[in-house]
Amino acid sequence: MSTKEKLISHVMKEEPVGSRNKVTVVGVGMVGMASAISILLKDLCDELAMVDVMEDKLKGEVMDLQHGSLFLKTKIVGDKDYSVTANSKVVVVTAGARQQEGESRLNLVQRNVNIFKFIIPNIVKYSPNCILMVVSNPVDILTYVAWKLSGFPRHRVIGSGTNLDSARFRHLIGEKLHLHPSSCHAWIVGEHGDSSVPVWSGVNVAGVSLQGLNPQMGTEGDGENWKAIHKEVVDGAYEVIKLKGYTSWAIGMSVADLVESIIKNMHKVHPVSTLVQGMHGVKDEVFLSVPCVLGNSGLTDVIHMTLKAEEEKQVQKSAETLWGVQKELTL
């Protein structure tokens, strides 16, 4: 008799039970690992699968996390073979070529499209009913690419979009007002990144419109220069990349925030990238961030945000820029 047999006596033969809320992270780079640890520490799933083409790096990261299993409640698995991801509820795609210092997010695009041509069909093969969350940049275009390559309905393909831009925005407004970001309600919509649109008309604290108190807020004529905050939001990522080489922690937390809303069916409203054709005067098939309701089925509803004419024009301009790139892509 083995030690195990002496220690434990079987009462019944266990039937294999699939994971009820499995999450997969594709890509074990800085963003993938920050997303993984954020998901683990929020205890969102009973199984976390990780997949990457870089076998040694993947194996090392998985082992490193598994060594902390005592402190977690989640089973952690990893393999370069996508069968490890089977039956995932949510699949988070962070893989792709990394943005270099000074490189625009749009520049990355065709490099990442080619990577997606391998990743997306594999996800669909093993998790045909999953909710696909795209984080790789340029996120709006790659969410469109993932939607096209997957054949999924639009409500099951979501881009992390401006969830992080809005978090940065709320943090900086909070700093200026000496308030916690959760008490500063503010939204950034449109493209994630350089042409994102701050909705100054909607910024409020406890329902008090800040533009109601300062009608010039967000404009050139504003003596308090609130406009600089949006510039800081846009430059923030570039600044972090310049200082430490990449961004990871905040986007990882942002991803876990979105995964939580889906897994726990919270019906929370998030600015995420979705198909906006027909909204805010957008005519083309593009994905941009607008406030959306996230739950167990994916993206269930879109909130009709009241935008000023100038804000709407900026969203349309974003859409035109993205469509200009998208129509050149070879899918």
Curated annotation (Swiss-Prot):
InterPro entries: L-lactate/malate_DH, L-lactate_DH, L-lactate_DH_AS, Lactate/malate_DH_C, Lactate/malate_DH_N, Lactate_DH/Glyco_Ohase_4_C, NAD(P)-bd_dom_sf. The gene is ldha. GO terms for cellular component: cytoplasm. GO terms for molecular function: L-lactate dehydrogenase activity. It is found in: Cytoplasm. This is L-lactate dehydrogenase A chain. The active site is at 192 (proton acceptor). NAD(+) binds at residues 29-57, 98, 137. Pfam families: Ldh_1_C (PF02866), Ldh_1_N (PF00056). It catalyses: (S)-lactate + NAD(+) = pyruvate + NADH + H(+). One of its GO terms (biological process) is lactate metabolic process. Pathway: Fermentation; pyruvate fermentation to lactate; (S)-lactate from pyruvate: step 1/1. The keyword Oxidoreductase applies. It comes from Notothenia angustata (Rockcod). It comes from the Eukaryota. Substrate binds at residues 105, 137, 168, 247. Disulfide bonds: none annotated. Its EC number is 1.1.1.27. Homotetramer. Interconverts simultaneously and stereospecifically pyruvate and lactate with concomitant interconversion of NADH and NAD(+).
